[in-house]
Amino acid sequence: MRLCLIPWNTTPHRVLPPVVWSAPSRKKPVLSARNSMMFGHLSPVRNPRLRGKFNLQLPSLDEQVIPTRLPKMEVRAEEPKEATEVKDQVETQGQEDNKTGPCSNGKAASTSRPLETQGNLTSSWYNPRPLEGNVHLKSLTEKNQTDKAQVHAVSFYSKGHGVTSSHSPAGGILPFGKPDPLPAVLPAPVPDCSLWPEKAALKVLGKDHLPSSPGLLMVGEDMQPKDPAALRSSRSSPPRAAGHRPRKRKLSGPPLQLQQTPPLQLRWDRDEGPPPAKLPCLSPEALLVGKASQREGRLQQGNMRKNVRVLSRTSKFRRLRQLLRRRKKRWQGRRGGSRL
């Protein structure tokens, strides 16, 4: 047998290594299915082929439903043909005015052009710009109706009726074709204001020459212009002062007087409190009866207490007597038994 000792280098100093006595094995390693992984070369793992076949069912592109959002329909309001023609005329007239320029004398040039151009200007103010975005059909129809009514009013105005002016003679009416010495300039149109064109048309047209359009007839009585005579009287009359106001009616007869209540008369001073309430006065006979009843009640209560005491005493004495008798009997029995 051979002895295999462990070398000294593996153990620390001053410590003896343990000696293992084992016999060496003469058997050689044999490759087998178990230890082939330990001693042999590693071979790649091969997966067996799939014998069964299966088909993958994928949805076709035609059957797939792709959710999409419908685009919003944009409706644009088209201008009427009459309004576009009027707008073109106004642009050409504006270019001609820019070419001529202001007068050399420094004064404003008078409006010598016919009043049709002024009518076209007003009609260009009345016609709105093309609308963009989502527009309801109801609002489109209403605006088209108002535009047609305004164009009708301008055409009625340009046929030869008079024009009201603040500086014109004969009732404030100028004949057709003559310029106004100081023409009244209408204010600029306010956006999002549907009543402004109707107000301007009512100021330009007279009361007798109002057109039969539904847009202008809807305006109230305050919007309609007054007669020239009424306008003269209103201008000539000075403004009333703030003091001239209708006074109220005065009540006829003397004013009603309220009855004054007399002050409370106190029988005691303010610092002192009220006197104590008095008890009701009783007759002497009633007092005597009350005292007698009180005495009887007291006597009854005293008698009850005495009776309770007596009963308690008698019961105690009876109990004591019974106890004494029992003791005597016991003593007598003991003595008699001891003697026997």
UniProtKB/Swiss-Prot annotation:
Superkingdom as given in the UniProt entry: Eukaryota
Comp. bias regions, Low complexity: 228-241, 254-266
Renumbered residue ranges of the record's region Disordered: 75-130, 215-281
Compositional bias (Polar residues): 91-126
Compositionally biased intervals (Basic residues): 242-251
Entry-linked Pfam families: POM121 (PF15229)
Regions of compositional bias (Basic and acidic residues) in chain numbering: 75-90
Protein family per UniProt: Belongs to the UPF0607 family.
Protein known as: Putative UPF0607 protein ENSP00000332738
Organism from which the protein derives: Homo sapiens (Human)
